[in-house]
Design a protein with these regions (language model features):
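Solvent-exposed beta-strand/loop surfaces of large extracellular or lumenal domains
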Residues: 82-107, 125-129
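Histidine- and/or cysteine-centered catalytic micro-motif in compact active-site loops
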Residues: 67, 79, 120-122
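Beta-strand-rich binding/interaction modules
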Residues: 69-89
Length: 172
């Protein structure tokens, strides 16, 4: 099927979509992956470095290193599933962060500036069309009938608290 044929192409596209220059004077960070990138903008090189264990946790640290101080905008993609997201630049809280939008940080950047992004990665029970799924950040937990480990339509009760939060426990 098309997923088997086209799925591997997505991995090759990661470097092209992780960072993007949508307009003059702006660079977007779309994916949160440990990485280092150099972007040419405004007649200089700007190095961006990401440190993260995402999606194991929701913390991302981005270091910005322009060759010289420069004014430009960094757009952080805020995932739609993150109900509570915090963004800081050099320890100062950024206001107006909204799920499903870009957080635009316009400032004069200097070498060593740090952006901290903390996403709300709690597991949540999602119920739609008489079906259930558990989402934990960008990961959707699903049951696959191909494993033949029971009847897929078998009813189950997934306990939640604080609305739709699910407690998950890792197994080894």
């Amino acid at each position: 099927n098309c997923c088997n044929a086209n799925g591997p192409r997505a991995f090759a596209m990661i470097p092209r979509v992780m960072y993007r220059l949508p307009s003059t004077g702006r660079v977007d960070v779309n994916l949160f992956i440990p990485s280092q990138a150099t972007i040419e903008m405004g007649g200089q090189s700007i190095a961006l470095s990401q440190e993260t264990e995402y999606p194991l946790n929701g913390n991302v640290q981005i270091t910005v290193n322009p060759q010289r101080e420069a004014s430009f905008t960094i757009g952080l993609r805020i995932p739609a599933w993150s109900q509570k997201t915090a963004v800081e630049v050099n320890g100062q809280k950024v206001e107006g962060v909204r799920a499903g939008q870009y957080c635009l940080i316009e400032r004069t950047w200097k070498a060593g500036d740090k952006i901290s992004l903390t996403t709300d990665i709690k597991a949540r029970l999602i119920e739609r069309n008489d079906m259930q799924a558990i989402e934990r950040g960008p990961v959707v937990l699903a049951r696959d009938t191909r494993f033949r480990d029971g009847y897929i339509d078998e009813a189950c009760l997934i306990p939640t608290h604080d609305g739709n939060i699910v407690d998950l426990e890792p197994i080894s």
